[in-house]
Structure formats: structure tokens, C-alpha cells
């Protein structure tokens, strides 16, 4: 693949993997597995112990917007990247990871977001792509997820790290960020 041909490779993956637009969060996705084992939630409901999806970020959908899950969310970069991954845990400092395959540059292919952490991802190179597999445990359900950073979380974290600016928070809440990186 030619450098800068992230859209071409993303389109190949979208077709090969049978992906669709991920509503709300953005990116391209498809459910690929759901555990036959169930777990009981505190409210008495039973859910599959986990589910797993393909997620692709592409130049036309470079951001996976702010969202928070009531489940742990494990992301593994399969191909492409790097990807900036910002986590806002319910307690403790915000952190930023770079998902990639070059450990000498501090990149990691695996990021784990604990339940209750606000998370957002974006391509470091807007012309690149990333293929990520994510496993959520207990399984993802729409009623146990929120999309779009809420005012309380925003006010709690903005400026708490030198890099955690209002502009960054805004960019990660927009499918098509407008600010240069």
C-alpha cells in the first residue's frame, strides 16, 4: 500500500469484513462474536459475558467519538495506526495512549478502558486507517452506553493535563475534526 492510501486500505477492509457505519460513535463496525456464557448484572438482567467487534477508522471517519460504557472495553490494534486513545476514568487522572506497533516510540497495540471511563479515539495521521478488534465485557448493550461527552465530565477534566484542552475535547466529539493536530 502506498503511503497516504489509508482510505484505499480502509475501503478494502470495510468490504472484506462486511462493515457498516457505527451510528453515534462513528467509524465502521460489525459484531463478530458473542459469548454463549451469560453473567448476571446487579439489576438482575443476564447478558452475554462478552461480545467482540471489528472497528475501522478511515480518513472519512477518523474519530470514534466520546462514549462511556458500563462494561470493560479491550481494544487491540490489528493493522494500521497509530491511533490516539484518550481515557477519562471516573476517578484519577486522564490519560492518553498511542495505539500502534512501535514500542520504541511508546506505542502499544492494546488499550483497556475500565467500565465507566469516557473514551475517544482518532487517527494520528488523518489520511491513515486503523483496524481494531474490541471485546466488551459484559457484552455491550445500547442502554448501558452513552455517546457524547457530558458537561460534568468535560468540566471535571478540561485543563487537568497540559494536553487536555477544550479544543481536543471538541475534536474528539466530532466525526470530522477541523483542527490541525
Locate each region found by the language model.
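Non-catalytic, conserved peripheral segments adjacent to functional cores
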Residues: 1-111, 120-121, 127-128, 138-141, ...
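Histidine-centered acyl-transfer/condensation active-site motif
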Residues: 135
